[in-house]
Amino acid sequence: MAKKDKHDDALARNRRASFNYFIGETYEAGIQLTGTEIKSVRLGQITIGDAYITVRDQQAFLNNANISPYKQGNQFNVDPLRRRKLLLHKKEILALDRAVSKEGKTIVPLRVYIVKGFAKILIAIGTGKKNYDKRQTIKERDLKRELGKNLKNFH
């Protein structure tokens, strides 16, 4: 049996990331969550569309990721948009910090998934696309779709 890719069972995806950024090197990081937050994440109640990562004092943080409050959490629920620490090796954090210090580079979250009971996030160093780059991406996507339709109709 073929080995299953661990990124296939993503609980949340940032589908706009590849449209808005040229994706470079990727890293897998753990997310420091409270008990009710991990329960919400396992239920798929997380949104990373507007999220971004910052590096400060040799620590990486996930900002603006929305984890909905757990229904049975009551007083243990925390702010859904709070800043969450990312668990990375020191060398990885320094590499991210060096990359972001260059003009036009940012760290974008790509997807959230569970590995052996722990919440993980796939992050990447991205370079922002200009509007003409985005239009080129749309043209390529439409051309690929049209080619697929033509091949389907040909058979």
From Swiss-Prot:
Location, primary (coarse class): cytoplasm
Coiled-coil residues: none
Cited Gene3D superfamilies: 2.40.280.10
Gene Ontology MF annotations: RNA binding
A Pfam family: SmpB
Keywords annotated in UniProt: Cytoplasm, RNA-binding
GO biological process: trans-translation
HAMAP family: SmpB
Assigned protein family: Belongs to the SmpB family.
Protein name per Swiss-Prot or TrEMBL: SsrA-binding protein
Species of the source: Oenococcus oeni (strain ATCC BAA-331 / PSU-1)
UniProt gene name: smpB
